Amino acid sequence: MFSNRLYSPLRYPGGKAPFAPFIAKIMETNGVTGGHYLEPYAGGAGVALDLLFHGHASHIHINDADPAVYAFWVAVTKHSTELLDLLESTPITIEEWFRWRTILREDCVASLVEKGFATLFMNRTNRSGILKAGVIGGKSQNGNYKLDARFKKDVVASRIREIARRQSDISVYREDSLRLLNR
């Protein structure tokens, strides 16, 4: 009843995605298969994406109060071409890590797509995918793993493209989860 199918471009070790088959079964049991599904604390939105891609939900609503995560999901669903261009053109280096960390952490002038890409870059190059964690391999890059160890651009790009194809079936929010649930 658990899944290891991964559809999210973000990495969240220990995330909710493996529970998608269980949620699908609950939806089926309650006669709501094919309806809308809300993931109030989206993060990587693994459950929502799995349900959408396997036809258990016709529309998913992903919500995350974190402005960085929200920017990422808006970039994927509304500006995927720009996001993919950044993904393709940005080298995975420690210099770029510092650049994107600055964009993510500081109140600097950056577009929503740049903020979204900074989220992706940090998620893929930081320990355990934690946005505020340190870089994989350390700043001197002398660890057993290097910062690109979890950043397979081709896999990430493929996932972004698949999600972008379903953009009309995905709504993205940055709201308080309880208020959103009470709408």
Model-derived regions: residue spans:
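SAM-dependent nucleic-acid methyltransferase catalytic core
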Residues: 2-27, 32, 76-183
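Conserved S-adenosyl-L-methionine
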Residues: 33-95
